[in-house]
Curated annotation (Swiss-Prot):
Entry superkingdom: Bacteria
Source organism of this protein record: Pseudomonas aeruginosa (strain ATCC 15692 / DSM 22644 / CIP 104116 / JCM 14847 / LMG 12228 / 1C / PRS 101 / PAO1)
Name of the featured protein: Type IV pilus biogenesis factor PilY1
GO molecular function: calcium ion binding
Oligomer and partners: Interacts (via C-terminus) with host integrins alpha-V/beta-3 (ITGAV/ITGB3) and alpha-V/beta-5 (ITGAV/ITGB5).
């Protein structure tokens, strides 16, 4: 069997345990990118403590469950999964566990060797003993306590029994079973089961192995057993016997390998002293010092001890506690004050009538502050909010409001389900008889030493510690249970819950000089990832722009009748429109299979797909039942998608007409004057939405690339670390000519939502058509579609979508994709070179129209390795008289499109230490002051991997301006190898708090060093400039990830600085207005910091005894900048937090862009 080999990388717990990342972990390579499925500004960066307790009692040697069937080992039906759930199930795939080794300091993972059917190991971990399953097989009853016990039935070829009787047939009636010999196709699966799953111990070893092998490196893990004296002390560091140094350490390197070695060598014997194990785990959390659970780097560095670090205990057993003691009294029935000042009085579902139970211990270690000397900053986990009744919310055991250092315990019982009858177990912690406990109709059974009621104590303990209980009876259920526990922990390692965050502001074109309108998107993680699109009117009051709310798409959609039955939700189809309704009956068999998966149970197949379709359409009847989550609104979170408005024609007629002389743009534009306006925006509910100007949803589209994870939106755990991105890209709208007519086309991208692009013809909003979709099946080098596409007319006479290939593609390459707008065919893929073994991908391009005729000539884009590339989109004729001619050069010219400069970058961005600086935002272009070529302005920074959530204060990110002199269509076979030494440095010299006409602001002042472009003889002296994002040499982790705006003699940009406190979420933003020709301070005032509606000296700052222009100001809001015009006709730049009037400078040259045809998006 082919093994899977890869290395482990760092990521966040929540991301690593989300389904998509977990499933892909087996095939990723060493340098794989960890694309976050959480908004990074909400992620807190402290990994949890995970304490693992496994049962090594003698009963773990049993090859059956439950204990009550022990006397049936010599009966035929003992070999039936229907009677003995531990036995081979032909419908289950028994995966090989993973073998971890340390090679040259790197953890390597591969499958354990597959057992041979004719010589299968009795223990696949130790590869000891063997049996020929083709002729010498006997059913195992017990294995692993120094002796083996097998059925007395005669040895034979491996077999199993199917239950073939009627439903009334007694399960101990041998006539109800039919013997099946293992077929040739089943042999490997049976051998895997025999060697790695057939006993409780083997199944536990394998299940834990498969769950933990993909756990991220920054999780901190310790382990213990119940009995083994060498390994029954949590975090002791014991290396005796087979404990392999169980100190609490980061789950990396040798410590990671030690954990799997410990699993491999598990031996069984003795009783079930669970309470002592619980005590050891709880008391360990009180430990101080370098080996304590809150040490910064356990074993190396104690301080700082982060007060937001959660701690989780996983307790697995197959039996009932016995032969031990606890000393906490009747903790769950005794009144007490909690560390946050709340008072507890005996109440359901916590209380019972027994002392010193496992449940008492669990409550004690939840309610006690393990480290009162540390601040209480654990994040509350409230997946079931109840604003109307805060007390009920606090005491709901599904929530964990504790902010103090405490222990949450997850319990896992093996082979115990049939004993859970009163209260009745129905598959999950908070269902079945649990409701009778809450209502007071039942009490928790009294637990005592070796009592059969102790099985309920496992359930009760999970409730008391705000964890969960899992009951498994078969190996496959055990594998799923371990994985579910890690998924639940990842849900508590969730992004911070935040109220509505405004993420984008976009004006529309339906207003006039007196009233303007704008759309604002927002999301609220504290409301189960609710999203909204709000329309505002914009007016000026007291010289400031005032927003007046007109409607909320969220409210209108939630008020929709009939559970979403009337919504027009479309997906790819085969009709003339290329679309079909999203209904259960319209789905293919494979699509129905994808929706028939339970996201809360590791995608186990179920039959709820039709209900999931109804849920996604807006039907709310299944919420908070049937394991479907509760939504605060139907509209999902809108985080990175900026709305695009479509009303009148996109271009000015006199500019558009010459591009396509055969088309009559004026006629098209006249027809669009009466087109019903629409606003389109993507949301993380799986859809692109279209709304009219009254806020009614008129259209929604589900891209094929997100379909495979639509079912996750129904998950109970979605409110935590299970959040996913879907249609998170900003739609791009443009008018284009194809098929003999003008059309209005929308290009959609997904960002972290998936690897896909789509094009819709939205010319007629009542008759939208799907032009095409592109995914990895069509283009393997397509990664997550973070880059923003551009629609352009090219020299081959075709309209095209030009975009970067995105990140985390199959081969981690970077390439410019040129896609035929009409058909979706890849016209050209221009692949660039890069460093091998380092992930790469091309970011958003900026197109240049050198002669302003509306046809793109060049494209500029950066990549993750810090290279700035130029692409020539012109014919390859060196002596062509007019390489930029609008004339159609014919389809063949596309073969001449190429990577400029002989395949070399225009510039490679590195910091002062020589480390590459990733480029993820589109460059901006301005004409060089000499009128020769462009200054290509770009910034560096990356903000989409989990590790990017925390500020990197070890290095600076940078804004560059690089002179590209070879822009006359010449055959540019090479470019000068530029370094920082060829550039003029600018600096941020001052950050200060100041007041401008009663408006308080924090501002920055940049240097104003001139750039000496030319020597006296006309040769090049300096080739550009750079500005490191740091104030007076202080690094804050500031970076540029949003597109810039070049207007007149100023370049406007917004940076982001992640929070450098790992116990805090959020990010800060700075808006800059700089001189694009020098990268420094402008000679004129840029921002209306005094909020007057005009820009004058009242917004200047006194610096070095003179009034100077402010270079940057801190602003609230996310999503980059939008350029608009205020009521006085002056330009203004808007973030999601506020709008600032800007001055583009004296004798402005107007907007610099790739072409004079401007879209409204």
């Amino acid at each position: 069997m082919k093994s899977v080999l890869h290395q482990i990388g760092k990521t966040s717990l929540a991301a690593a345990l989300s389904g998509a990342v977990l499933l892909s972990a087996q095939t990723t390579h060493a340098a794989a990118l960890s694309v976050s499925q959480q908004p990074l500004m909400l992620i807190q960066g402290v990994a949890p403590n995970m304490l693992v307790t496994l049962d090594d009692s003698g009963s773990m040697a049993f090859a059956y469950a439950p204990d009550s069937i022990s006397g049936y080992g010599n009966y035929t039906f003992f070999a039936s999964n229907s009677f003995n759930p531990m036995y081979f199930d032909p419908n289950t795939q028994y995966k090989l566990p993973k073998k971890l080794t340390l090679v040259n300091g790197q953890v390597q993972i591969q499958d354990y060797p597959a057992p041979n059917f004719s010589s299968a190991w009795r223990n696949g971990f130790t590869r000891s003993g063997s049996i020929n399953l083709s002729n010498s097989y006997k059913v195992t009853i017990e294995y692993g306590r120094g002796y083996d016990k097998e059925s007395t039935i005669k040895a034979d070829a491996a077999y199993y029994y199917d239950f073939t009787g009627s439903s009334s047939c007694n399960r101990t009636n041998q006539a109800c079973y039919t013997r099946r010999y293992v077929s040739t196709e089943q042999r490997q699966n049976f051998a895997n089961w025999y060697s790695f799953y057939r006993t409780r111990a083997l199944a536990t070893q394998t299940a834990a192995n498969l769950a933990f092998y993909s756990l991220p490196e920054n999780a901190r893990v310790s382990w213990q057993l119940l009995n083994d004296s060498n390994c029954n002390q949590m975090g002791s560091g014991s290396s005796s016997g087979n404990c392999f140094s169980n100190y609490l350490r980061d789950f990396t390197g040798q410590h990671r390998v030690n954990f799997f070695n410990w699993l491999e060598k598990l031996s069984v014997n003795g009783g079930t002293p669970l309470r002592q194990a619980m005590t050891r785990a709880g008391e360990f959390l009180k430990k101080t010092g370098v080996n304590g659970p809150y040490a910064y780097r356990p074993g190396t560095q104690t301080a700082p001890e982060y007060s937001c670090r959660g701690s989780y205990h996983i307790l697995m057993t197959d039996g009932l506690w016995n032969n031990d003691s606890a000393n906490v009294g009747n903790a769950d029935s005794t009144a007490r004050n909690l560390p946050d000042g709340k008072s507890y009085s005996s109440q359901t579902p916590y209380r019972d009538g027994t002392f010193d139970t496992l449940a008492d211990q669990a409550f004690h270690y939840w309610a006690t502050d393990a480290r009162p000397d540390i601040d209480d900053n654990i994040k509350p986990y409230i997946p079931y909010p109840d604003q109307a009744n805060p007390s009920a919310e606090y005491w709901n055991p599904r929530n964990d409001p504790a902010t103090w250092q405490h222990m949450v315990t997850y319990t896992l019982g093996l082979g115990l389900t049939t004993s859970l009858t009163s209260p009745r177990w129905e598959g999950s912690t908070f269902s079945g008889g649990y409701n009778d406990i809450v209502a007071g109709n039942l009490s928790w059974p009294r637990a005592s030493n070796n009592d059969s009621n102790n099985v309920y104590d496992l359930w009760h303990a999970a409730v008391n510690s705000r964890g969960e209980f899992f009951s498994a009876d078969s190996p496959d259920q055990l594998v799923a249970a371990f994985q579910d526990i890690l998924n639940r922990i990842s849900g508590k390692d969730l992004p911070a819950s935040r109220p509505a965050i405004s993420s984008s502001l976009q004006e529309d074109d339906t207003g006039d000089k007196l009233t303007r309108f704008a759309y604002q998107t927002s999301f609220a993680s504290d409301k189960n990832w609710a999203g909204d699109l709000t329309r505002y009117s914009l007016t000026t009051q007291d010289k400031a722009t005032v927003q007046t709310k007109l409607w909320s798409a969220q409210s209108i959609l939630d008020a929709m009748p009939n559970g979403g039955a009337g919504r027009k939700i479309m997906m790819a189809g085969s009709g003339t429109s290329g679309l079909k309704e999203f209904t259960w009956g319209s789905l293919s068999a494979d699509q129905q299979r994808q929706l028939n998966r339970d996201p809360d149970r590791n995608d186990v197949a179920d039959t709820k797909g039709q209900d999931r379709v109804a849920f996604l359409r807006g039907d709310r009847r299944k919420e908070n039942s049937d394991n479907f989550r509760t939504r605060n609104s139907i509209l999902g979170d809108i985080i990175n998608s900026s709305p695009a408005t479509v009303g009148k024609a996109q271009y000015l007629t006199y500019l558009a007409q010459p591009i396509e002389p055969s088309g009559n743009y004026s006629t098209f534009a006249e027809a669009q004057k009466t087109r019903a306006p629409r606003v389109y925006v993507g949301a993380n509910d799986g859809m692109l939405h279209g709304f009219d100007t009254d806020g009614n949803e008129t259209f929604a589209f589900i891209p094929s690339a997100v379909f495979e994870k639509l079912h996750k939106l129904t998950a109970r755990g979605y409110q935590g670390g299970a959040h996913q991105f879907y249609v998170d890209g900003s739609p791009v709208v443009a008018d284009a000519f194809f098929g003999g007519a003008w059309h209005t086309v929308l290009i959609g991208s997904l960002r972290a939502g998936g690897k896909g692009l789509f094009a819709l013809d939205v010319t007629d909003p009542a008759n939208i058509k799907l032009l095409w979709e592109i995914g990895v099946d069509q283009e393997p080098d397509l990664g997550y579609s973070f880059p923003k596409p551009t629609v352009a007319r090219l020299h081959n006479g075709k309209w095209a979508v030009v975009t970067g290939n995105g990140y985390s593609s199959l081969n981690d390459k970077a390439a410019l994709l040129i896609i035929d707008l009409e058909t979706g065919a890849i016209t050209r893929k221009l692949e660039v070179t890069g460093r091998t073994g380092v992930p790469n991908g091309l970011s958003s391009p900026r197109l240049a129209d050198n002669n302003s005729d509306g046809v793109a000539d060049y494209a500029y884009a950066g990549d993750l390795q810090g290279n700035l590339w130029r692409f020539d989109l012109i014919a390859g004729k060196v002596n062509q008289d007019d390489p930029f001619s609008r004339a159609n050069d014919g389809p063949a010219v596309a073969s001449s499109f190429r990577v400029s400069f002989g395949g070399q970058p225009l510039y490679s961005a590195v910091d002062s230490a020589g480390a590459a600086q990733a480029i993820t935002a589109a460059p901006s272009l301005v004409r060089h002051p000499t009128r020769k070529g462009y200054i290509v302005i770009f910034g560096t920074g990356k903000y989409f991997e989990n590790a990017d959530a925390r500020a990197d204060t070890s290095r600076a990110q940078t804004l560059y301006g690089i002179w590209d002199q070879q822009t006359k269509g010449e055959a540019a076979g090479s470019t000068p190898r530029l370094t920082r030494g060829n550039l003029q440095q600018q600096t941020l010299d001052l950050q200060a708090d100041s007041t401008f006409a009663s408006t308080a602001r924090t501002i920055r002042i940049a240097s104003q060093n001139p750039v000496n472009w030319l020597n006296n003889d006309g040769s090049t002296k300096q080739s550009g400039w750079y500005l490191d994002f740091m104030v007076n040499g202080t690094l804050k982790g500031e970076m540029l990830i949003e597109d810039m705006i070049a207007i007149g003699q100023v370049v406007l940009l917004q940076t982001i600085t992640p929070n450098d406190d790992p116990c805090a979420d959020g990010a800060s933003n700075w808006t800059y207005g700089l001189d694009p020709y020098t990268g420094g301070r402008t000679s004129f005032t840029v921002f209306d910091l005094a909020r007057q509606g005009v820009v004058d000296s009242k917004s200047d700052y006194s610096y070095n005894k003179q009034n100077v222009a402010v270079s940057g100001t801190e602003q609230k809001g996310l999503g980059g900048l939008t350029l608009s015009t205020n009521e006085q006709g002056n330009p203004e730049v808007c973030s999601s937090g506020e709008c600032l009037t800007v001055n583009p400078g004296p004798n402005t040259r107007g907007r610099q862009n790739w072409r004079p045809i401007e879209g409204k998006n």
